[in-house]
Amino acid sequence: MNQSEVLFAQARTVISGGVNSPVRAFNGVGGNPIFFTRGKGAYLFDVDGNKYIDYVASWGPMILGHANQEVINAIKTNLENGLSFGAPTHIETMLAEKVCELIPSIELVRMVSSGTEATMSAIRLARGYTGRDKIIKFEGCYHGHSDALLVKAGSAALTLGVPTSPGVPKDFAKHTLTLEYNNINQVYEILKEVGTEVACIIVEPVAGNMNCILPIDGFLQGLRKLCDEYGIILIFDEVMTGFRVALGGAQEFYNVEPDLTTLGKIIGGGLPVGIFGGKCEIMKCIAPLGPIYQAGTLSGNPISMSAGLAMLNVLSKDKNFYTTLNIKVQKLTKGFLAKAKENNIGMTANVVGGMFGLFFTDAKSVTNFKEVSQCNVELFKRFYHLMLEEGVYMTPSIYETDFISSAHSDMDIQNTIDAAGRVFAKLV
């Protein structure tokens, strides 16, 4: 047994399943998870002394690479002042101002401690504001693990094969209508029946929890139009896409403005944090201004706020940051596709901003959950473990997106492409 296997066995004796988030258990690819000791730049280092080029990026937040010095310095400075006060701090306001500056649809925000909290609170707000109960979400999209949203969910719920989790009461699930992502006609038809009962439509503008599925032309625009027509709150779940697709998020990239937005991951610079925000008229309904309750002991934690502010300051300094990031992703995915073609392996890729998804399929495009599920999962599993042997760490599920960071060099990308070529040759 290597040291990761020893530690995983130890973890299983005191942690349920040996992990604190299901996808980390490697159920989607088989084998045992890797235990890491540190990260620096584009690299991760495990307990057995192995070095990996990292395309998981802590599931998105590490857009500047691991242990970015400006973020680390901000954390160190604020650590000396104390960890948590349970009271207002100026740095909360500073981060809120930065978010409102970068995402024009957000006029007021509320800090929370996770993406799940953000989406849960945004939906409660939408229900309280509209006085309606039903919500619409899309198959394969993941919005955290609150009960109302674990109905045909994405991410690890798909990997486990239980997209609708046991423990979700039928009375909760009956208010959640789950439709096909990228099918605006289906939304149109269901709203003709129950449009006046729907409080909100929540959507990942890029569905990053069933791999990387991009919105087809007119889908997001159609949602905006239908929400306006029926008085429905449009919520963009940008926990993954916020500051990852563009500086103003996917809503800037696709030029569609939601009523409410949820953020996480990058917004905390790698520390636990979530934010929801949007139009003043809606946000003023939250306590203490309004009757809709939301609270949290660690909300606005000064250490998380300092990390998030430092990261956003770095991202907003370089006007070419996202262009450069996308060039790297394009080079990487074109390299993957070229090597796959050389070995007669069917593959397609989706790319947006600093996100990318690889699909083992002969289809020319993949646009929804059903098409993702038709990809060759057994081939992916073999590919995954062979890439690990080559020192390349990718997300361990066909239903997860991969990420690139500004720390990835041209050599890192070329080394990854070369590794993929050797792996594809073994898959034939």
Curated annotation (Swiss-Prot):
Q: Which residues does this entry mark as bearing N6-(pyridoxal phosphate)lysine?
A: K265
Its EC number is 5.4.3.8
State the InterPro entries in the record: 4pyrrol_synth_GluAld_NH2Trfase, Aminotrans_3, Aminotrans_3_PPA_site, PyrdxlP-dep_Trfase, PyrdxlP-dep_Trfase_major, PyrdxlP-dep_Trfase_small
Location in the cell: Cytoplasm
Instruction: Name the major location.
Output: cytoplasm
Q: In which pathway does it act?
A: Porphyrin-containing compound metabolism; protoporphyrin-IX biosynthesis; 5-aminolevulinate from L-glutamyl-tRNA(Glu): step 2/2
Q: Which GO biological-process labels does this protein carry?
A: protoporphyrinogen IX biosynthetic process
Q: Does the keyword Hydrolase apply?
A: no
Keyword Repeat (UniProt): no
The organism sits in which domain of life? Bacteria
GO CC terms, sorted: cytoplasm
SS bond partners:
none
Gene Ontology molecular-function annotations: glutamate-1-semialdehyde 2,1-aminomutase activity; pyridoxal phosphate binding; transaminase activity
One Pfam family assigned to this protein is: Aminotran_3
Q: State its cofactor.
A: pyridoxal 5'-phosphate
Q: Which UniProt keywords apply?
A: Cytoplasm, Isomerase, Porphyrin biosynthesis, Pyridoxal phosphate
Catalysis performed (reactions)? (S)-4-amino-5-oxopentanoate = 5-aminolevulinate
Q: How does it assemble?
A: Homodimer.
Query: Which protein family is named in the record?
Result: Belongs to the class-III pyridoxal-phosphate-dependent aminotransferase family. HemL subfamily.
Q: Which HAMAP family match?
A: HemL_aminotrans_3
For this entry, the protein name equals Glutamate-1-semialdehyde 2,1-aminomutase
Organism this protein belongs to: Vesicomyosocius okutanii subsp. Calyptogena okutanii (strain HA)
User: Which gene specifies this protein's sequence?
Assistant: hemL
